[in-house]
Amino acid sequence: VPCDYTRIFEVVEKKKDLFSANNALQAHFNRIIVVSDSAHAMGTTINCLSVAQVADFASYSFHAVKNLTTAEGGCITWNPKNGLNDEEIYRAFQIYSLHGQTKDALAKTKPGSWEYDIEIPGYKCNMADIMAAIGLAQLERYEGILNRRKEIVNQLDAGLKSELIQVLP
């Protein structure tokens, strides 16, 4: 069951005078940034909007038990309607996920591109090629997977109707 993002944004806007930005991204919003934990929410909608569209940022998990899997890993999306500089955000995520390096492995294979900088103490959390291949295969069959999950939910709902259990919408 998703959060009431309308209410969350009402509270964030009402209290934004208490907010003090610590970096350029925060200053752009001039309020608390709302992040949706969308780990299990790939393909879901809220009021006809993708779950990725209701918050400033949305994080997804691609763990083996999630709706779309790469065995491990995940992704972060952001809502472009806020006038964000997509390239700057992408570059920041790339650097943080590649040990702080300014070039990924593919970029370093090009002639004369072996040189790179380490700008920050980053992390190793970029997706391996084999995991990406699994994810692409899952994505091709995702609509069928999602439809099958909906069928199972409908069967469970129907089976529980005779019990003293209230099924949430």
Language model segments and positions:
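Glycine/serine-rich loop-strand microenvironments at binding/catalytic pocket rims
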Residues: 1, 53-54
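Catalytic PLP-binding core of fold-type I/II PLP enzymes
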Residues: 1-48, 80
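Active-site region of PLP-dependent enzymes
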Residues: 22-27, 40-47, 54-169
